């Protein structure tokens, strides 16, 4: 099983792969050690959609995906984020300056839940 370490190094991870890999291997262990499979099986666990876990070249892949729109707390934003960097991190342009005042807004229709802004 190929996997990434998720939260240790990835800024956009949706999960940490270590627990998932342990659970998968606990279930499949007998298949691997007793050679019950017809051929080699490549399994990958990716923490995000950026393919750090080689999910694109595996037979079976488990990928963590963000499913909720990022929440913006405009009262804490200036103390925790570089606003221009946060805006630029969005590949679809879903994050914009708030036209009604300070802070940012997220366009729900444009957000692809990549996690770059987290």
Predicted regions and their residues:
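Cysteine-centered iron-sulfur cluster-binding motifs in ferredoxin-type domains/subunits
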Residues: 7, 47-51, 71-93, 104-118
């Amino acid at each position: 099983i190929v996997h990434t370490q998720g939260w240790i190094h990835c800024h956009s991870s949706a999960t940490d792969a270590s627990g998932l890999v342990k659970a998968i291997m606990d279930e499949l262990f007998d298949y691997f050690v007793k050679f019950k499979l017809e051929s080699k099986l490549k399994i990958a666990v990716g923490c995000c959609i950026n393919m750090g876990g080689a999910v694109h070249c595996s037979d079976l892949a488990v990928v963590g995906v963000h499913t909720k729109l990022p929440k913006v707390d405009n009262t804490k934003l200036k103390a925790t984020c570089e606003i221009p960097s946060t805006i630029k991190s969005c590949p679809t342009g879903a994050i914009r300056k708030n036209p009604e005042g300070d802070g940012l807004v997220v366009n729900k229709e444009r957000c692809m839940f990549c996690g770059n802004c987290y």
